[in-house]
Amino acid sequence: MTCGFNSIGCGFRPGNFSCVSACGPRPSRCCITAAPYRGISCYRGLTGGFGSHSVCGGFRAGSCGRSFGYRSGGVCGPSPPCITTVSVNESLLTPLNLEIDPNAQCVKQEEKEQIKSLNSRFAAFIDKVRFLEQQNKLLETKLQFYQNRECCQSNLEPLFAGYIETLRREAECVEADSGRLASELNHVQEVLEGYKKKYEEEVALRATAENEFVALKKDVDCAYLRKSDLEANVEALIQEIDFLRRLYEEEIRILQSHISDTSVVVKLDNSRDLNMDCIVAEIKAQYDDIATRSRAEAESWYRSKCEEMKATVIRHGETLRRTKEEINELNRMIQRLTAEVENAKCQNSKLEAAVAQSEQQGEAALSDARCKLAELEGALQKAKQDMACLIREYQEVMNSKLGLDIEIATYRRLLEGEEQRLCEGVEAVNVCVSSSRGGVVCGDLCVSGSRPVTGSVCSAPCNGNLVVSTGLCKPCGQLNTTCGGGSCGQGRH
């Protein structure tokens, strides 16, 4: 991994120069500050100031890995476009005694193992992130489902309210019908009472008529008996008249026979002429007249009585027939009214049962709707709480993912720097490894907190930027960084 910018400040004079310098290094003490991921190390032992890309060869500065922050390279530099006179510092051509640490390979192996373990942890974190993303999608789907479900069932309350209002209107109509039917029932009961009174009156009239009929029947029977007696008397009188007639005729015949046997002629000298025939004829005529008048009177009286009784029987029969018809009509009306009353009672009971059932169903539906609404509100509240927890977990996972992305980017830069270092090759240098703070120190080791005596290299987390300056480095001392041409405003740590 290469640094974003390189700045070199020499302590020989206050002036500064850029990172690509055309002049050779001057003997002075330099503090080269590198910026690995973390850890601080100081390097001391280099004399002479030089840039990262110097015309007159020098050391090439860079940073890599979590465990080391400085690497020395070979002498390199671009060839000038033209041959010019170059002044070379002879002190730079002397070989350096860097004293390479023999434990560098072990440290590299440990670093590789650490990278493998970190990669395994990273893969586990990736799997966890994927699992949490799936859980997040599942919970988002559940939340959307519950929200849609709430939206779909939010219309239940007005629906139940309308249904309850309809049931109330029906109950009011049923109550109005019940009142109307009650008034009709009262009217029918009053009419029924009137008909009952009329029926009782007609029954009383019928009883009176039957009593009169019985009395008249007795009178008719008496008249018939009297007629029979009179007819018997008439027959007896007729027989008696016939007997007397025959008797008188026989006496007359006997007398005439006696008279014919005797021829005595008696002459009376009187003015009376006894005529028995006239007397008998007169008596007979009188009796005949009496019998005729008696018969005529009896027949006329019998006929009148019969006609009267017939007229009375016909009149009473007609009255009885009308009374029977009225009684039958009243019975039919009573039966019809009784059936209507029973039907009205049945309808009233059915309507009352329907009203009670409707009220019970409405109350049950309302309580069920309230229970469902409470359950939905509880489910929505629980879904909101679960969503809040999932959002927090998702935020934590995203924070972890962000940290892992940062670590991945750091590992990628470390691996790129390691590959570049392996490609360039390793020179014979003395490397002192300090794995406690993640820095590799070449030369004298400056532990964080101590102050270097000579020029040093400090490795601190500064996003991969290399700062070379004359002065002290944090946390060893106060940093004093000067940048050439005003290209840098502050030192990176």
Curated annotation (Swiss-Prot):
Q: Where is this region: Tail?
A: 419-493
Q: Which UniProt keywords apply?
A: Coiled coil, Disease variant, Intermediate filament, Isopeptide bond, Keratin, Palmoplantar keratoderma, Ubl conjugation
| Gene name, Swiss-Prot/TrEMBL | KRT83
**Region: Coil 2, residue numbers:** 275-418
Q: Which Gene3D superfamilies does UniProt cross-reference here?
A: 1.20.5.170, Single helix bin, Vasodilator-stimulated phosphoprotein
Which family is it part of?
Belongs to the intermediate filament family.
The protein depicted here goes by the name: Keratin, type II cuticular Hb3
Q: Where is this region: Linker 12?
A: 258-274
User: Which stretches does the entry tag as region Coil 1A?
Assistant: 112-146
What SMART domains does the database record attribute to this sequence? Filament (SM01391)
Sequence position, cross-link Glycyl lysine isopeptide (Lys-Gly) (interchain with G-Cter in SUMO1): K217
Residue span(s) of domain IF rod: 111-422
User: What is the scientific name of the source organism?
Assistant: Homo sapiens
